Amino acid sequence: MKEIKRGKRTRYSFERVQTPIPVPNLVEIQTKSYQDFLENGILKVLKKFSPITSSKSDLRKEKGFSLEFVSVRIGEPQNTVQECKERLLTYTVPVYTTVRITDNSTNEMIEEEAFLGYIPYMTPRTTFIINGAERVVVNQLVRSPGIYFVEEAKKTSGTKPIYVAHFLPVRGAWLEILLNLNDEVFYARIDRKRRINLFLLLKALGYSEDLELLSLFPYWIDVEDEYTLQHSEGLIILEDVKTKNGGLIAKRGDVITQGLIEKLENSDIQKIKVAHRYAVNTLEKLNHVYGENIEENRAYIEIFRKLRPGELPRINAAKIFLRNLYFNEERFELSEVGRFKMNNRLEEAYRKYLIEVEGKDPQGVEEVKYDETSNVLTPMDIVLASRNLIEIDKHPGTMDTKDHLGNKRVRTVGELIRIEFERAFSKAVFMIQEKLATYTSLDKISVQSLINVKSIIATINSFFATNPLSQFMDQTNPLAELTHKRRLTAVGPGGLKRERARFEVRDVHHSHYGRMCPIETPEGANIGLITSLSVYSSIDKFGFLITPYVKVVKGKVTNEIVYLTADEEENYKIAPSTIPIDEKGNIIPENVTVRYEEKVLYVNKNNVQFIDVAPNQIVSVSTSLIPFLEHDDANRALMGSNMQRQGVPLIETEAPRVGTGMEWEAAKYSGTLILAKHDGIVKKVDAQKIVIHRIDENGKEMYDSMGNPMLDIYELLKFTRTNQDTCINQRPIVNVGEIVKKDEPIADGPATDMGELALGKNVLVAFVPWEGYNFEDAILISEELLEKETYTSIHIEVYETTARDTRLGPEEITPDIPNVSKEKLRNLDEDGIIRIGAYVQETDILVGKVTPKSESDTTPEEKIIRSVFGEKGKEVKDTSLRVPHGIEGRVIAVHVFDKEKDGDLGPGVNKLIRVYVAIRKPLEVGDKLAGRHGNKGVVSKILPKEDMPFLPDGTPIQVVLSPLGVPSRMNVGQILETSLGWLAMLTNRWFATPVFDGAKEGDILPELYKARKKFGLEMGDFEENPSGKVILRDGRTGKEFDHPILVGYMYVMKLIHIARDKIHARSTGPYSLIHQQPLGGKAQFGGQRFGEMEVWALEAYGAAHTLNEMLTVKSDDIRGRNEVYKAIMKGKNIPEPGLPESFKVLVRELRGIALDVRVYDDEGNEIDIEKL
């Protein structure tokens, strides 16, 4: 065990593996990507459309103007992050571009800077603030452009496979080359529509001679192999066949006949070069349909006929049509990534082509690369893909797997926004061309008026506001925030559809190792589609996920770190990081287990090429926070990972006694801590700010050139609301005079303790059934947890109201509210706004507001008062902002925005008032608690501490869990955590047990026994074979329980599923306008739905009157419910129900589709249902 420093705390770590590299910056994927967009992406898009020339309808009837973009400049944000949040603004920066306009007739030019618009800017916490709300742009995992060799799904069983070479561009039509083994013919499918003969396409691309086509698919026949020779009848010879004496047996282009076979058998010839049967069949089929030796132009016309059957084929139109599909950069784009993938995939096929078709020396082409650079398809691409299909037929194992990570790439923030920016700008280009054409001379051109800023900004803003990849940030706690920024999603625009995603797409694949976490994923419909990046994973320049490995040479681990993509990794044998290594870096065992391709092999240590960098390389940040993960079932680990993100920040934070060593990294990169920017000495500390005087390497205080001290001032966030209504409150953890190092934590945020993540509390637990109160995952807790406020959390709700202009005059914010007692107004100030610090309960007034009443609402008496007192007697309606049901708390802030001071607040709004109420939520029955191993439960009873079971020294247990929650769930990690937690508490130490490299049972139990013996707690355990169990006594009777019980300290979190937020009751409330039925849900103060199945239940009981009531007066019989209310108030019998509104709605809907529906009574008289 060794000591390690984590944040401001020292932990004792059980790690055995020395990790050669530190944990990388966990949010770098976001920052780097967006920075690249600002620095290079915008300019690249502008350059792509440069130069823009004026359109043909030029006023000057001569050479027009051309416009090009020279450079881009990014300005400074206008508002701070905090201002944007408070005033519901978007945090943006202005973008300027330098534009050069040239007069093409005189070559004169002007250069001017133009404003491109405001673009949302990433905050230091890698989020965006859009209309006051923090949002995150999630990384999208999409199929990489390139070429894929796959098998087409069979339509009928018993048929042979169809192999497909699928060209997938970033933009443009698809092209698929098919090899149909049923008729042994090559086809090309163009743009997912029509299938044509492949040779027809190749003829159009310049391979006009039949023999030239066939020679692309050569094949050598061994004449001595009688079986092959006999089956070669019908094939076409590609080279003259001569005997050793020079005698000609067959010419190039001859068809092999039975007679020729006999001649060959009797000759001294060993090999002949023929065309592959598939090529011969394809040519025969082509000639059968179109006649022999069709030339290039005819091929174009036939393709055009096939694709556009109704149109008259003209050669020029046909050529342009095909060129536009695959060979025009404006219509078809492979992209740099697509070309890179395609060159790599076709490299082997290209070498074979050089040897077989061009006759190159095999030795000379071993190192040759296929280095095509075109951004569109080339005829060679199509030829190589077709040839490779024959190889696929021989070796079906070389087909591509769609789910391999080598075939998927990540679209990060920068790229997603660049795509939107490009889309917006491509529309603006036409406008620029049109406007340029209207100018007659250079000096009259106004650069700013050429560029339409509005359309560009509108597109980018709509991306942030509406695109499914721009998400409202999960800010429940720092881990939720960090995980959200590291999320990968396969759904969204250009991705998969949730309903159509196959099981294979969602499953764990061997290529995910070290790149994508196999554990952290949601449990619902998105399982496997939304995942998380692994701890050490990052992205290469093409967007492929890479992970680091340490190079191993001849059984010795070097210091060289190599990052590999999923494709590159397939070629190497990689050992796990936990294999034993001596001090010099030599692998100790002779044979080790390695990963190779998708297999696990047992090889000699000299064959190992790489070794993992860390044991937690495979998992995400959330999962690597679970101690003893190696002892948990994967399904429960998944729940543990997900539930840590739901932990509520508590009033008093406490880091886990049993951690994994990742708590510091998770907190550091979450952005909730304040880290020192430079080395320095703390000069001042209070609740609001920390002042640090910088020091140099020698520890001397630094001063600027004017002799002023160089101070870093850190402002602390106090009681700020998050997106999920939890509370951000930063607290200093340094003292005056303390020396701090750069990147050292100086203030804790929510759910952090001494710089480490602290989502829950270390509580004393016992695994024992207790009177059925912990049946089925229920949890019994001690009142002690309430007394100490262990699980009390602060939540901040915001309530908002506006004073608007109405038709009858403006609304008014005032304390002068009609028919409200002085008692209710006691906390309002002279403007009618609640004072800060007031304690409020449901229905209390937060902001007094009155709205003018319409004339129709006034009674005759009020009209007389109006005529006497004039405007003062004008009647107003009370529309004050009140505290909703079920809420009580303290007002901590009030923000008032005025139209005159703060600018536009929206149409017709004169004043906007926002009131923040802090609500204290202690632990209650019904709240959800969870450990880190997927062990969750609901509080069933809060017992007085004197009734709780207690230890031999009298310490009462704090939480009683059911022992039956462990065996079937197979999350034994919680047992080991409990025992190690007890050892940590008894010895007052903090432990780190990293995942896959943590403490073993033998490390914990003997040490725990020694510590217990020291404190006299060894009852129920034995030194020879310690179990960690103890004899407990029942708090009510004082008697011992029958058997020793497992006791210890477990880290338990309170989750955001809080009972008091969900509990809800309604007597009378709002109704739906159309159906006149009560609304649903707590937010609408709705009722309980009495659904179809509940109706069946009443029908089954024969409870006719109850059923009648449910379907009428308690639901949507408007007249009936009013009559019932009156009858109850007057103590009369309940009247007969009327007609439900839903029946009227049905009749109206039938009339809406032109059906004449009438209703008659028993005597046949027509009834007007609207009057009922």
Curated annotation (Swiss-Prot):
Entry-linked SUPFAM superfamilies: beta and beta-prime subunits of DNA dependent RNA-polymerase
Recorded superkingdom: Bacteria
Single GO cellular component term: DNA-directed RNA polymerase complex
PANTHER family in the record: DNA-DIRECTED RNA POLYMERASE I SUBUNIT 2
Assigned protein family: Belongs to the RNA polymerase beta chain family.
SS bond partners: none
InterPro entries, A to Z: DNA-dir_RNA_pol_bsu_ext_1_sf (IPR042107), DNA-dir_RNA_pol_bsu_external_1 (IPR019462), DNA-dir_RNA_pol_su2 (IPR015712), DNA-dir_RNAP_su2_dom (IPR007120), DNA-dir_RNAP_su2_hyb_sf (IPR037033), RNA_pol_bsu_bac (IPR010243), RNA_pol_bsu_CS (IPR007121), RNA_pol_bsu_protrusion (IPR007644)
Single Gene Ontology MF annotation: DNA-directed RNA polymerase activity
Protein name: DNA-directed RNA polymerase subunit beta
Function of the protein: DNA-dependent RNA polymerase catalyzes the transcription of DNA into RNA using the four ribonucleoside triphosphates as substrates.
